[in-house]
Amino acid sequence: MRKVRDIMSAAPVCMAPGESVSAAARAMKQQGIGTVLVLTDGMLTGLVTDRDITVRVLAEDRDPRTTPIGDICSSHLVVLDPDDDLVLASRLVRDHAVRRIPVLQDGTPVGVVAVGDLALESGATSVLSGMSSAAQND
């Protein structure tokens, strides 16, 4: 059975909660990702997504240059272990209505699993699989 480690995006981008939303957005653009993990003293304390930036900063007319990511990140997180199976990962995505799940090994972030990763794994006939493998808009 395939494991989370087989499909996760490794080496997640991590930032401190005091970093600006602008810095997080730049990192997302440079890395071609939609998630930055928020670490406090090396421990995962939050997750900020491109959607969080849109909904919690831009839509509320907050200044992304001065708003810290710690103020907008999600802090009630669902996490996976690299050795968890993909059935569990899919169930957590569905049950918690999340699109991205941090992967921790011994408390240290080692990756992120996105709903797109799971869709690609589900096979070429999946509509989500086709959407997930399409070229990104830049």
Predicted regions and their residues:
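Tandem CBS (Bateman) regulatory domains
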Residues: 1-11, 49-79, 85-94, 112-138
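Short hydrophobic/aromatic-rich motifs at helix boundaries and adjacent loops
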Residues: 7, 25-27, 40-42, 60-62
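The conserved cystathionine-beta-synthase
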Residues: 14-32, 80-97, 103-104
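A glycine-centered beta-loop-beta connector
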Residues: 28-31, 36-52, 93, 101-116
